[in-house]
Amino acid sequence: MKPRTTLRPSRVGAPALEQGRDAFRKQAWGEAFSRFSAADRKSSLTPEDLVSFAQAAFLTGREAEGADILSRAHQAFLSRGDTQLAARCAFWLGFTLLINGEFAKSGGWLSRAGRLLEGEPDCVEKGYLLLPEGYRLYQTGDPVAAHAKFVQAAASGERFGDKDLVTLALQGQGRSLIRQGEIARGVALLDEAMVAVTAGEVSPLNAGGVYCSVLEACGEIFDLQRAQEWTSALEKWCASQPDLVPYRGHCLVRRAELLQLHGAWPEALEWAERACELLSQPAPKAAVGAAYYQVGEIQRLLGRFAESEAAYQRASEWTKTPAPGPAQLRLAQGQVDAANAAIRRIAEEVRDAGPRARVLDAYVEIVLAVNDVAAARVAAEELCGIATRWDVAFLRALACRARGAVLLAEGNANAAIAELRQSWGIWCELDAPYEASRVRILIAQACRELKDEENARLELAAARQTFQRLGATKDLTRLSAIWPGQFQSPGPLTEREVQVLRLVASGMTNRAIAGKLKISEKTVARHLSNIFTKLDLGSRTAAAAYAFDHNLV
């Protein structure tokens, strides 16, 4: 959102207004909002200053105030006879409401913008109005028509030299092409949009929106390298604007997803919970749901089933998009029939290839648990088809694991090992220790079918070591069930908790432990809480005594 006319001198001569304008130019959003507020209390602001005031409000998380101020700018432009700029304000009010899921209010403002422009010559504001049309088509399952709208919008932006419109339209085109399965073309357009953003050619509100959209797309197509690169870029961009409130939550969710994949679960949980806190302020409903869903995923992997269920429930309050996590939770709890019913229903609902790939991965595991090998075979082949079309490493790893699991269930252990070895290798390349260890369990089972007890034992031992380090308690329990008596009990503490306990026993403070292990003090405190609970201890002194008694120091 940006005015396309040069700021007119205000009738207000107070220093606060000039200070507000200066702070706005410097992207000091908190100061800009404060100074504009002071100037606004003394006298009326120009419409252009009201637009800047509104942007400062939005960028500091004051969404309701920002909308009120922008509606004032809309009225001020109308009073001055600037129909196109009044329409632009109405557009931004409507589009923001649309993104946030407030469809009735959104429709009212967008209709007003369209009506104002009916008698106007071709202008960039008419190009902007193509964006919500494209967005609606995309959301309602017509990416081809959506792409056409975004192409028209980009052409309008080019005609009028409006970088914001061009960039927003490019990311819309990219997302629409990806939804059509044209991954390479779509990603190229997203990269082009990001070039404009990282070069500083796009206004902050729109830059943040493009960052979040591109990161969401990376997640949809499982492009981990791009997700890592653009997440780091978004973190730096947010850090350069300390007062910035929107977009930080989205950034934390993506960072949590990457940390989870790479096995840093306590840190991932901390980032995901921080995202929930940040996104509890006005934010798109899907973003809040994604944050809580991520918390649920990590808690499930850690074996904290009550906490996982609570987080999944919170996620469902914000988004109705079905996801496999709750069904996987039921499987982990031993409620196999409930898991089977849930995943079959979800598979009927989710049709888009990206989200469906995750559903199919869970589907294969769950239906094999109820011995429906035929259904698992169909799902595995569908997943392999998606992986072949998209040619993404993450999907290839999922597909090989699914096919290997089905072959193992069908009694073809040799063929299963070949598929599973491919999956394991890809997970290792992606630095995904948990996923790699899940495959190792399947390889061990295949080796056992072939009477290769030695290699089966080695695979299980390696998987057990990783699960213990990660704190994957449910998987450790599953290991013991698969091969009873093979291993001694790993004890109640994870490897990381043992590290923390040793350092506590040596007399280190939480801050010192955090520095040594390169984790946050909050994570150290969480580990200590788990240690006290698992060992039934009440103090650091008792924990230190336990460490000495059990030869941990």
Name these PLM-found stretches.
Residues 393, 405, 409, 413, ...:
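Linker/hinge segments immediately adjacent to helix-turn-helix/homeobox DNA-binding domains
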Residues 19-25, 51-63, 87-103, 125-142, ...:
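Tandem amphipathic alpha-helical repeat scaffolds
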